[in-house]
Structures are given as C-alpha cells and as structure tokens.
Amino acid sequence: MSTLEAVAAPPAPSSAPPSTESKPDVSSISPESLTPLSSLLAELQLEQVVKTLWRATNHEPARFHLSPSHCVVEAAGNKQQTLKLSWGDVLGAHVLTADGELVQTPVDVQNDAKFLLGVFACVCKNHKPKTLKKRRVEEFFFRFKGEQMQQVLKLQKIINFVADPRNQEIVEKLESLDQLEIVERPQRKFLVLVNPVSGPGRAQQVYETKVAPMLRFANVETEVKIMDHANHAMEVVLEIPLGVYDCVVAVGGDGSLYEIVQGLMKRADWNDAIRQPIGIIPGGSGNGLAHSIAHQSEEKGKPVNAAFILAKGLPHDLDITSVRNGKETTYSFLSLEWASIADVDIGSEKLRMLGGLRFTVAFINQLVFQRPEYPGKIWYLDESEVGNPPHYFETHDPKSTDRPTMDLFDGEGQGPPADSQPEDGKEDEAKEEKADKSGIWKELDGHFRIVWVMNVSHAASDALIAPGAEFDDGYNYITFMDGAHSRKDLLAMMLAIETGDHMDKKGVQQVRTRAFKLVPERSTDLMCVDGEVVEGPYLEAQVHRGLARIMAVPRWQSKE
C-alpha cells in the first residue's frame, strides 16, 4: 500500500460507522516534554525522501526549523535545498511505517526499524497579486529510525497543533515556538452530506478523490451520508445532535445547502441549530455560495480550494434573509430572482447534465424567443445615512426560540405603504415615498428586464453579480435593468457578469438594502429564492446579519 493510499483511503459507505484514522497513542506526551522545541529539533536525525527524475529514491539529511509563521526544512544533499511552508498551507503530519501504513501504537518499536514522518500541505505556487489562488496537495516524507520514535511523535504533535486553525490565535501571539504550550483539543469531526445527483452527477467522485484525502491529512474525522431522495439533507439536520459536529458539509450545489438551512430553521431549537457551522464543496451547477466564500478568501472556486477552506477554516458569520409571501417564510443565504433571470434559472433545470453551461443555453433561448419585459414594483429601504446594521444576536436574545422577526416591515410606523400608486410620468424612477425610523422607503415602478438580488457576491461560478458584497455585511444587493433598455443592453450585461464588469454597462443599476418588497404585476411570473420557486403574489425580505455560520479561511499573519 502506498503512503497516499494509507492516509487517504476512500470514505466508508454511508451505512457504515463513521470512519476514523488509526493514530499513534500520544496521550502520554505532556506539554512540558514538548519544550524546548529547539533542543528537540537539534536531536532529530531525519532523512528527506526525494524522488529523482528516473523514479529512484534518494535519502538526504534534513533538519526542521519551526517558527510561528513557517515550517522550514533544510535538506543537505548534492544540491542543498530549503523547503518553506506557511502554516496557513500545512494540513497536518502523520507517522507511517516504511510501507506507508499508519503507525497505531509506538510499542515494541525496533530501534533499527525504518519509519516515515509525512507532512502534508495544500500549497499555492506562483500566486500573482489580484488573482485567485490555485492550489494542489503536496506530500513530504522524512525517514527516521525507530529509536527516535518518541521525539518524532513530539514533533508530529507540535506540527498538528500549529497547523490546526483553531490554534491560530495562540500561535500568532508567540515570538518563538519554544514558548508553545500544547492545549489538548478534541479531534475535529465533520458530518458530510453528499448529493450524488447534484449538477452533472460527479459530487460523490469529487468528494472521494479530492476532498476526503485532504480532510484525513488535516486530522479531521468524517461521517459520510449519501443523500438518496429529495429533502434528505433537511431530514438529516432536523435530527442531528448539536455540539457533536464541528461542521455540516454539503457536497453538491446550492440546493443541497438550501435544504440544510431550511432544516436548521425548522427545528424547535433553531436559535442554537442555526449556529451550527456549515460548509460547502461545489458539486452542483451553480455553486454560488462556494464561489462567494472562495472569492472573499482570494481562492479559486475549485473543489480542492473548497476542501482547503474546510480543512483550514473557522466558523464565520453568514447573513440569512427571511423571505415571506403572506403564506410561508423561507430562509435565503444566496439570492432572489425575478424577471428573465428567474425564467432562465428554472427553465434550465432540465439541462442539469450540462453543469454551469445550462444557464448559458437557457439564457440564449430566453433572450431570443421569450418575453422581454416584466412589469412590477420594488420597494426597498434606503439607509444610506444610517450606520452599519447590527448583528442579529446583538439585538435579539440568543436564548429565545421566537422566530426571526421582520421588524423593518412589522414594527410600528415601519414598512412601505400598503397600497401605493406611481405618479404620472414617474414610473421608472426611484421615489422617496415614506420615511420611517430606519430610513427611507423608495419605490422602483415600471417594466424590468432583470432583477437579481444577492446576499453574497456570486450567484454561480461565472456570475459575480455583487462584487462589493460580503457574506456577513448585513445587506442585500438589488441589481436590475429596467425595460427602457434593449435586449442588446441585457446581452452586454450578461456577457460581463463573470468578472463583475457588468456594473459599468449601460442600464445596469444596483442598490444596497436591508429590506425590500417585490410585487410582480403578473401572477404568472416566476420568482426564485436560492434557485427554488417561491409563490407570490409578492415577496417581502429582510436580512438578519450574521444569523448563521459558514466555514471560511482566517487571515494568517506572517511573522518572519
């Protein structure tokens, strides 16, 4: 068995117990025995395993140097080389037998027996400023004799502690790792919900080949469940115990995560459940939230980058928008769509096998053959003179199980007028109609070609609709084009959304708001929330800042 196979075996079937890695018994290593680090590193005699061009293996003497910012290895061979890894890229370390089997218990170790210390990282090479990071997994192996097993296990424990993102704040405060005191933490555990039919149908393969190995390298225990029917993910999270999983991961598209959010909000203990950290591996057609998280961390929206974010991430606040139609309330993390984009989103469902290409095909059909304009009204709350919105639990009791209120609509003196008529000749203008204690309600009235409301930056992998949006800023971003502009203008907008340059195109407007009301004139118009059809006759929406939590990469500080 190769070292890669030993550490990154495929996950167990969903019916099997949670998969766990065999690990050395290091419980007997006390914090005192781990210091000073410099003395430990000076005693170690390691040889780096180097593959040559002819697939032969060389073993060159190597020495570790660890700082609060980097793991440095100096190899003294014919060509002296230095390996420098940022802790922000290091996943973890494992001790292996010479055959690549994980060492289970360091007992009866023969002094002359050969073992390997494996260090695993997800590195970004040749990254240029203002570009997204492309990553790949790299493995580094160091041979040692059994007589040094205890010292290597100490080094392994230090590497895993410093590489664990939960310890970033501790490590960053140190001038030297000689000052490090190990704080015992439970192993991270993720619940992984795989939707095998999401998008082009490769979600399970993506997880097994690209994600599972990285989580194992990072010492994350996983429990994998394969979703086999509609709303399965919702059913799972309705029943999961809280406080058990460090993250609930959806492997699929935005629809998979939509089920998880609805399930958490349906629980009687929703106020605690919605704080369960969630994560996403892009395996669907749109993958808007995955790309929004990656974009904010300057990462590409690929599965490897998403797995890196899970392995090295920490929970960060995520805005949730309550959307109601007078009959029911749904909870959105991504977007609300009306007019041509809603027809494209829903009309392309039958083209799922095309992946992201489905939206392009459907849009061309919409532009050429379908109705061009959609009459209706949009009311939005303009708070340009008001400061940043508060986080939800700053103004609401975290222990209360009362559902999130839409106080910007329902409070005394709040909300847009219940029944308003546009002034003559002013149908396409925004008008100050009503001021309340939160700001000014303004109306957009007329015909629209597209209305796209974003909670985050990306609606899909190739749709950067709200370049300035962050997933915890407390705002929705309404991007629209009115009916006074041509199909050519709409086409120019859509051709530019991949880079966000559509904001400079003719007729494109965007407003930022915490609350809005959408009223289509035609009852047959489609409206979508996070890609799911929602009935009218109207939709009211209000953002709850930081209500949920999503895994995102922290900003690692460099100390040279």
Locations of regions flagged by a protein language model:
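ATP/NTP phosphate-donor binding region
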Residues: S2-V251, Y258, Q262-M265
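Short polybasic amphipathic segments
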Residues: A42, T52, S69-E74, F115-F120, ...
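Conserved beta-strand elements of beta-rich interaction domains across eukaryotes
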Residues: C71-V72, N78, C124-N126, V197-G199, ...
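Non-catalytic interaction/regulatory modules that flank or connect domains
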Residues: F115, K442-I450, A459-A469, D482
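Generic C-terminus detector
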Residues: Q148-V152, Q156, R514, L518-E560
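Catalytic core of DAGKc-family lipid kinases
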Residues: F217, M227-H229, E235, L242, ...
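Catalytic phosphate-donor-binding core of small-molecule kinases
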Residues: L310-G313, F363-D382, K426-E429, H458, ...
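Short conserved micro-motifs at the rims of enzyme active sites and ligand-binding pockets
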Residues: D345, P390, D462-A466, D489-A492, ...
